[in-house]
Amino acid sequence: LWYEFVTKRIYRKIGAYNIGFNPYEKYPLERIVPTEYDSLFRRQLLHGTVHDEGAAMLGGISGHAGLFSTANDLMKLMELYRRMGSYGGEQIISRDVLKRYTSVQFPENNNRRGIGFDKPFLNNHELAQEDCYPTKGASPESFGHSGYTGTFVWIDPAYDISYVFLSNRVYPTRYNNLLSEMNIRTEILQAVYDSIFSL
């Protein structure tokens, strides 16, 4: 299975033992933050199971949603990405594969996306801070992911940044949008860039 392959070939090699899918199968619920009271699909408190309905229908294991982790293990994964697949002196993921996945795929269509990763807007450097994605400071080489439930990771090899922000935007319900309205995730990221630029 894909999940077993990723666990053995990536997560274990970087020492990430608290990252994976369906954590309710491995850990007591006291160690897992509840996600949301789902009043639409499952009609219950989601606790240790994937939030995304499509991934839930796939048994909680998918390539687009459902990965649970501690901040520490997620940072290890981001460091693997920042180092272009190298970790602890071993090339775990091909540098060429990561380069391809983190490159803009369709710039001619003004599409900023990589394969599985967000990228800054193509004209980010021309925009005001409030119009940028994710922030004005992000280099064209940077990449990351902004999750629906409130997670945010951003890697910027140009400035040696690996940024992990874990929160729960959808608790108690998905209608809680304060995190997005206040731009907390990207404001903190810009503060990281500002501290680097001020040196």
Predicted regions and their residues:
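Short, surface-exposed loop or secondary-structure junction motifs
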Residues: 1-140
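Structured C-terminal helix/loop/strand segments within mature extracytoplasmic catalytic/sensor domains
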Residues: 73, 145-199
